[in-house]
Amino acid sequence: MILVYNRIRSIISSSLGRIHVRYNSNSQNRWLNRQLKDPYTKEAKVQNLRSRAAFKLMQIDDKYRLFSKNRTDQRILDLGYAPGAWSQVARQRSSPNSMILGVDILPCEPPHGVNSIQANILAKRTHDLIRLFFSKHFQLNRHDDLHKDHGYFQNMLEEELTHVKDTELYREIFTSDDIYETPNTNSTLIEREKFPVDVIISDMYEPWPQTTGFWNNITNQAYFRMANTSGVSIRDHYQSIDLCDAALVTAIDLLRPLGSFVCKLYTGEEENLFKKRMQAVFTNVHKFKPDASRDESKETYYIGLKKKRNVDKLDVFSNS
């Protein structure tokens, strides 16, 4: 059975009534051999981690101290979180009472102690849902099952968002741009509600174009997830820049002042411009390639520490 599977893979597209046959290639054999010999892959299985990528975040956290077990209310947002390895690390290295939300366009069962929604991080409504999830108005002692269309909790969040959208508090939190300049007793509360996240981690990457197989909501939406690198360094670089910018916009909108940020980037000619945008948002910006990253990989990680106050998206992106 294994030999037959390795020799040939048949993909049946029921909507088009066609069979696509793809033979195994030397590159697939090399990838499989590399996986079997890789020490991080083996150790991930031993530690019951969902992928070897967990060790990259561990090494980043060892150096930059993103998570804290001493903070009882740390709020962590994991972008492109499926299959959930980074969320596992965040759960292990933060306090039991910390709140962790994974966002991915694929439905994926989150690790124990982690919540998730299926959503497109490029959509403003997703930012509203994230903000609402971390707000004191959304009670987290509810049980929700994995939904075929939207993962966990999103249907509850959608209902809650509809209920609170016309309230004065919603308008104050979601539309206020002058919370720093208005000295009143509620300014700290409003700041915390508008910028509810302490740490944003992003390991997003983007897929190949899909030309067939659109047949239901899950596969249609899941396709737009940041899924597979192409192996073409120029293409991977430009796609990763777009996703890093999307993560950076999320940080501008949701990350609290002095908060921390991590994103993966494939190196290339636009890297310095992205670094400049990072420096407009964070006081300290670092570039780091963990030992768990393969030597031949073009990936690197940018870490932003101590987010600045009064960051304007237009200024950040128009000046770089």
UniProtKB/Swiss-Prot annotation:
HAMAP family: RNA_methyltr_E (MF_01547). Residues 1-18 form a transit peptide. Its main location: mitochondrion. This is rRNA methyltransferase 2, mitochondrial. It catalyses: uridine(2791) in 21S rRNA + S-adenosyl-L-methionine = 2'-O-methyluridine(2791) in 21S rRNA + S-adenosyl-L-homocysteine + H(+). Disruption phenotype: Loses mitochondrial DNA with high frequency. One of its GO terms (cellular component) is mitochondrion. Keywords: Methyltransferase, Mitochondrion, rRNA processing, S-adenosyl-L-methionine, Transferase, Transit peptide. GO terms for molecular function: rRNA (uridine-2'-O-)-methyltransferase activity. It comes from the Eukaryota. It is found in: Mitochondrion. One of its GO terms (biological process) is RNA methylation. S-adenosyl-L-methionine binds at residues 83-86, 104, 178-179, 203. It is an enzyme of class 2 (transferase). It comes from Saccharomyces cerevisiae (strain ATCC 204508 / S288c) (Baker's yeast). Its EC number is 2.1.1.168. Belongs to the class I-like SAM-binding methyltransferase superfamily. RNA methyltransferase RlmE family. The active site is at residue 264.
